[in-house]
From Swiss-Prot:
Localization in the cell: Endoplasmic reticulum; Golgi apparatus
Secretion signal, residue range per the UniProt entry: 1-23
GO cellular component: cytoplasm; endoplasmic reticulum; Golgi apparatus
Main location: endoplasmic reticulum
Domain of life: Eukaryota
Name the record gives this protein: Meiotically up-regulated gene 121 protein
Positions annotated with a glycan in the UniProt record: N121
Swiss-Prot/TrEMBL keywords: Endoplasmic reticulum, Glycoprotein, Golgi apparatus, Signal
Role noted for this protein: Has a role in meiosis.
């Protein structure tokens, strides 16, 4: 009987010690879209393993139906069915929070910089306002190069845009031109 009491106390102590840690894990999982590090990995089982996620960017212009997203020497990793968020990642520009939902059915291998234009110009994605959680609809992603700066424009189409052209796009390190 005494042994049973000792074991019970031991199990209770373990439970008390472990529970806060488990709560932290659950909390992180629930809010993981806001805690994606600037440097890190997101598991993508559809595209063979972990892919680097590095966010450098800012919204430089906002008009009624489009955003100009200024990206630096790293691009975002888009994973179908996942929501990847950039939060407070701007440098000399205004801090932003931007979410992208990527949908589709085809996985494109890691791209070289010479392949970006033709792929991005045929890529659709969802843009979402992270603060109001308002889905803005299907956007056509367009690429624009100006000297050493790469811009991607997400322009809301007046016509329905097919959002199943790609499953995922991985933009690895893009050297400055």
């Amino acid at each position: 009987m005494k042994g049973f009491v000792v074991i019970s106390r031991f199990i209770l102590t373990l439970f008390i010690l472990i529970t806060p840690g488990l709560a932290g894990v659950v909390n992180y999982a629930e809010n993981s879209e806001w805690n994606v590090p600037k440097y890190g990995n997101v598991l993508d089982s559809n595209c063979q393993g972990q892919k680097p996620v590095t966010f450098f960017g800012s919204v430089t212009e906002h008009v009624s139906n489009s955003w100009w997203i200024k990206l630096y020497d790293y691009m975002m990793t888009f994973i179908s069915g996942e929501k990847l968020c950039m939060q407070n990642v701007a440098y000399e520009f205004e801090d932003i929070s931007l979410c992208m939902d990527v949908v589709g059915s085809k996985c494109i291998p890691t791209l070289q910089s010479t392949d970006i234009e033709k792929v991005v110009n045929s890529t659709s994605a969802y843009l979402e306002n992270s603060e109001s959680d308002l889905t803005l609809g299907c956007f056509q992603i367009q690429r624009f190069q100006e000297e050493s700066t790469l811009y991607i424009r997400a322009l809301k189409s007046s016509e329905p845009v097919s959002c199943d052209t790609v499953r995922c796009i991985h933009f690895n390190h893009i050297p400055y031109v």
